[in-house]
Amino acid sequence: MKIAICQINPIIGDFRHNISLIKRATERAKTSGCTLAIFPEMSLVGYPPKDLLEKPAFIDENLKQMNSLASKIKGIPFLCGYVDRNPGKTGKPLLNSVALIKEGRIQKKGGKKLLPAYDVFDETRYFEPAQESLVFELENKKVGVTICEDIWNVADYEGVPIYDIDPLKQLHESGVDILINISASPYTVNKGPLRLKILKTLAKTHKTPTIYCNQVGGNDDLLFDGASMVVDRDGKLILMGEEFAPDLLIWDTEKVYDEIRDPWPSEEESVLKGLIMGTRDYSLKCGFRKVLVGLSGGIDSALVAVIAQRAMGADHVTGISMPSPFTSEMSKEDAEKLANNLGIRFEEIPIHQVYESYKKSLKNVFHGLKEDETEENIQARIRGNLLMALSNKFGALLLSTGNKSEIAMGYCTLYGDMSGGLAVISDIPKTMCYRLAKHINQPTEIIPERTISRPPSAELKPDQTDQDTLPPYEILDGILESAMIKNLSFESIVNLGYEPDTVKEVLSRLIINEYKRRQAPPGLKITSKAFGYGRRYPIARGKQPF
């Protein structure tokens, strides 16, 4: 028996596109002699549809298209994730569901029992937990189907279960021979190995081969990495799909496979591929085929430019240098050299005259006051204004270039360098930016070495460096990880060996700059706690650094 694992990249709410992907994949599976094709969680609608689920017309269309899809595909049974209505008289109105489609109709269906409500997940807002998982017979084998979170309640892999029920235990007590999990599980650093650990635990514990079919593609801030897997009954990984690309795996149940050992690329390679896919999908799914990047000659804009070029192609990327009176010659040279290395269009628009015009206009109002960060921010806002004008005129998406460390500290300017439609590296700490830049330069230098090696500077005043107002990035990123990822208290972070005054300053700035981050463009989520939908803090609050 052959089973096709169809790792597709859906567009949320684009039924025509998603059905086209499903039809093409089922045709490939049928041609390859497969007995069953499997598609990811909510593959008909795309995940996560968020408040589209509150629109009755959207649910109606989803059900209409599901029945239409069933009638169009013949000759191969398949599993498809979709949204069903809750037939019960109480609870939330919807179910996160999966259907077995065979012979032109929905033959059987089941649903998701465990609904995540943490970080970026908010499924209890819309869905009622399903009463039944899907179980069906396939060539004298009993197949059980779970949906994403249903397999994440395994105590063996990381402490105590977080749910009262265990869908897997219930399925295995019913005697399933094959376990399938359809997922829309977003990427974070090192999540792939964790998923594999769970699958291995399940397969070995229940002596059941386990299939994992994951969505791929970028949907807003979330990156779905695919990496679908098949683990045999002994817990050995025997098949694995591409990371960050559509794929179709075929598992032959009668074939003997060698174990795949150490399947994961380096962290830098994985993060870079995720950012490239996320930038491409966000741009194209939003209708943009061209992007703009402001090139300062620094490492952050260089990193974003490389990602943009690899995501969109050199012909669809323009780099803009906007030197001020404080921009060094080496910054101007490095910006142009980078653009040449990437083969992207390069334009230079000096801002000297505009900057002086601003200062002249404000001269009387600012009479007697010393120049400070106000004048620095004027430069950033001039640049933001020019970039948005170019975006507007040429229909290109502006990519902002701030990293996570700077955004955490408010070391950025509202309506200036924060301008844009997508914050590509807003979840990349500065120390990781350096790691990515060095990775990009292997084996051939793309980002000028001087850009990486010289002290980082916003160049908004003479002889400025980032460390004039920020701790060294190794220290800053360590404190931020402790506070944001590990949720450690002030005292616990100090006990790690950091200076109390430094910790207090970092946590205070993290708190007071919430208002800036609320106005930032959406950013691509890479870590387990990014700024955005999964981190919800009040703006007007006490300043005690918890």
Enumerate the predicted regions with their spans.
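ATP/NTP-dependent adenylation/nucleotidyl-transfer catalytic domains that generate, transfer
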Residues: 233, 259-297, 301-546
